[in-house]
Amino acid sequence: MIDRLKKSISKTKRAERSRFKLKKLGSRPRLVFIKSNQYLSCQIIDDIQGVTLAYATTSEKTFTGEGKSKKDKGAAKVLGKLIAERGSQKGVKQVMLDRSGMIFHGRIAAFAEGAREAGLEF
């Protein structure tokens, strides 16, 4: 139990530390990646104005991923392309990736690759 609590606290501290650094730079919008047990979601947030510019999730009815699952690497890559398209419609080209304390590997790396392929710069 203590190990789980320590792991959770460590992840929260990593997320806060990275968000503090991103907000300190603050000139570009943040691209936030969120993993849940069933779905993946992301949003582009402008911290200066405090608004969400674009949002995408694998739980949308219009979402069609590469595989059967809505939370694997294939779905993450398609989600990255989708958020890049929605961001470009709002005029967003450059963002800062907020990993929420997670390491840049697996689904997050696939998500970033899909977003870069579709034209987002970070």
Curated annotation (Swiss-Prot):
It comes from Leptospira interrogans serogroup Icterohaemorrhagiae serovar Lai (strain 56601). This is Large ribosomal subunit protein uL18. One of its GO terms (biological process) is translation. InterPro entries: Ribosomal_uL18_bac-type (IPR004389), Ribosomal_uL18_bac/euk (IPR005484). This is one of the proteins that bind and probably mediate the attachment of the 5S RNA into the large ribosomal subunit, where it forms part of the central protuberance. GO terms for cellular component: cytosolic large ribosomal subunit. Belongs to the universal ribosomal protein uL18 family. It comes from the Bacteria. Keywords: Ribonucleoprotein, Ribosomal protein, RNA-binding, rRNA-binding.
